[in-house]
Design a protein with these regions (language model features):
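Conserved, structured core segments of small domains
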Residues: 1-97
Length: 97
């Protein structure tokens, strides 16, 4: 498995984002529960988000992003996926608390 970071930028439609948020979070939770997401969350300023997929390859990461309700509803203005090579990892980073 490899890590892929999705750096997403939200479109300016906050109402759309708030309406879509519950299904987006349900989708992410379903991936997290089966080990496909290492971590995720919005930027503190609510302009975008980061998702870290733990998947086999770029094709799988692209597929998962394409299925995300934020992507299909147009909440994301832009999204970039980069394979991420972790050099240092804190011992608590596997804690889901």
């Amino acid at each position: 498995m490899a890590l892929f970071a999705v750096i997403g930028e939200f479109a300016d439609d906050q109402d759309l984002r708030l309406r879509t948020r519950p299904t987006h979070r349900e989708y992410l939770r379903s991936l997290f529960d089966v080990g496909k997401i290492a971590m995720s969350g919005p930027w503190e300023d609510e302009t975008g988000m980061l998702i870290v997929y733990d998947v086999a390859d770029m094709a799988e990461a692209e597929h998962l992003l394409a299925q995300d309700p934020y992507r299909s509803a147009g909440v994301l203005a832009n999204a970039t996926i980069k394979e991420w090579r972790v050099v240092l990892r804190a011992p608590w980073s596997n804690d889901n608390q």
